[in-house]
Design a protein with these regions (language model features):
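Short, glycine-rich nucleotide/cofactor-binding loops
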Residues: 145-152
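RNA-binding accessory domains that recognize and position tRNA/RNA substrates
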Residues: 1-143, 155, 160
Length: 160
């Protein structure tokens, strides 16, 4: 049995437990709470300068989804079969999008570690919170948004 399978059997789930957002002296601080049951509980913190306050509904939605992006890095510790979201919800379409991001975004990780798994079997995403209404942005935007994390892929993305 591979390490991948061993870890998945030993640590079946990754919990996105909670997050908090607070405004402190012209900055927003976001604290995330994660857990891999049987392995560890931990926090991740972000702080963003803020020239002005942001609508709380929008801020919470942004913070929640930033936390979803954070789960990908930490999920790699044990590659659990389930991602359980205890502090928010995703629509079926959003779950499909996040599963695709996990699978495609972890391509190099899986290749380097000899992990062979289908997109469907990599991770299931479960939400325990009730569904909430999606946010609708009425503003129009021009240009492209490129995520730059500092790795080789970021340079390639910018060149394309």
């Amino acid at each position: 049995m591979s390490k991948f399978e061993d870890f998945r059997n030993q640590y079946n789930s990754f919990l996105y437990k909670d997050y908090s957002v607070e405004y402190i002296e012209s900055a927003y601080r976001i604290v995330y709470h994660f857990e891999i049951p049987g392995l560890c509980e931990f926090q991740s913190k972000w702080e963003f300068p803020a020239k002005e306050r942001v609508d709380e509904t929008i801020l919470k939605a942004l913070a929640f989804h930033l936390g979803m992006a954070e789960t990908i890095s930490y999920w790699k510790c044990a590659c659990p079969k389930q991602l359980k979201i205890l502090c928010g919800t995703l629509s079926a379409e959003q779950k499909k999008w996040w599963k695709k991001l996990y699978y495609n975004g972890l391509g190099e990780f899986m290749y380097r570690n000899g992990i062979v798994v289908s997109k469907e079997d990599l991770v299931t995403i479960e939400c325990e919170d009730k569904a909430c209404a999606p946010l609708h942005d009425t503003q129009s935007y021009d240009g492209c948004l490129v995520s730059v994390g500092g790795g080789k892929d970021s340079v390639v993305s910018l060149e394309v």
